[in-house]
């Protein structure tokens, strides 16, 4: 299932989370094992995927077995000073433009709230996390920080840096895409990190 979620400027995250919650609850009635569900999100969708999994936990709904984050926005405040250094090499994302869009998405919700900055949320008890991000993108420093946070908390995850690659590189028809997809398939099928 690939939901087309409501977007800014006409809607904010609340409408999207309501839609995703309805879809997810319906899915839970149709499957035997929630651990067979995989949530995948790229860019803002990666932010949504992780924040949504955290919301599911708060609502005491079953976790998906796997959460795949492709170049996710993990900290919508964009306060990491390292990000500015990477911004110079990022052909797709600028911090100021990204922050403006996140502010529209957030509405009156603070940018450091886990729904906007999921690395600030409760990371315990979520589905297995696989994270990939290009090393030439603005979001790379936060992805490294997030991976270290997960390591420090003893949370199993897979971090797959896309060396010398750009934002959402697995969506482009390049050889690195195929390598990532093969790794991802192995991780999801074997359930080993």
Give, region by region, the residue ranges found by the protein language model.
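Alpha/beta-hydrolase superfamily serine-hydrolase fold, recognizing
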Residues: 1-193
